[in-house]
Amino acid sequence: YAGEIPQWDVSLVRPAGARLKTFGGRASGPDPLVDLFKFTIEKFKGAVGRRLSSIECHDLMCKIGEIVVVGGVRRSALISLSNLSDDRMRHAKSGEWYDEPDKNIYRFGYRSLANNSVAYTEKPDAMSFLREWTSLAESGSGERGIFNRQAATKQAAKNGRRDPNYEWGCNPCSEILLRGPKIDKNGQPVTGTGGQFCNLSEVIIRATDTKKDLLRKVRLATILGTIQST
C-alpha cells in the first residue's frame, strides 16, 4: 500500500429505487458501493507498513458480500477456511461480535455473511480438538466450524473419477467439495488459487411463466448446477 487513495465516480450507477426491468425489484443505488469503498480505505489505512491480517481480509470479503444485492435480494454466500493456529478467525463470531450494546453500534454485522471453519490438514491431537470444540460452543454462534482437508481428499478419490491431488475446499454450505490449487508430491501448491463453481443455481419466476416454462427452467438449472459442481 503506497498511501494513495483513488477517487471514484458513481454518477452512472442506477439511483436508489429505480425499477429493475429484467430481474425485478428496485435498485439499491450507489450508497452501498460508496460505503464499501470507504470501508476498504479505512482497512488499508489501518494496515500501513504491514500486510493485512487474516481477519482484515475476511472482513473485506464479507463487506463485498454485503453489498452484492440485486433487487433487494442477497446474491452472495461466503465461507472462510482458516488455520488451526489463527486465533483471530477462531473468535471472529465469538461473544457480542454483532453489536456494541452500550453504544448501540452495529459493529461487525457484515461477518454474518460468511460461514467460518477451521481447515484441518491432519488429524489433531485430543487437546487441540477439545480447545477448538470448546471455542465453538462458547462462541454463541456455533462457529468456527470444522473442515477436514484429509477427509475431503479421500472423498474426492473415492469413486476414482477425480484427481485427488488438489487442495480441497468447499462451497459456503459445505455440502460439496470445490477444487483449489493443484499440489505436488510434497503437498505444496503448484498452480494458482484454483477455483470451482458451487452447485447452487436459481430459477427466476416471471409473471408470464406457465407450468411448462417452470419445468424447463428447473431442468436447465439442475443440469447447470450438476455441471458447475463437477
Describe each region flagged by the PLM.
Residues E4-Q7, A47-D59, G71-L81, S229-T230:
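Flexible, glycine/charged-enriched surface loops at secondary-structure junctions
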Residues A18, E42, C62-E66, N199-E202:
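Contiguous, well-ordered alpha-helical segments that form the cores/surfaces of helical PPI scaffolds
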Residues G25-A47:
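Glycine-rich and small/hydrophobic secondary-structure elements
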Residues D31, E42-K43, K63-Y166:
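Conserved, charged catalytic cores of large soluble enzymes
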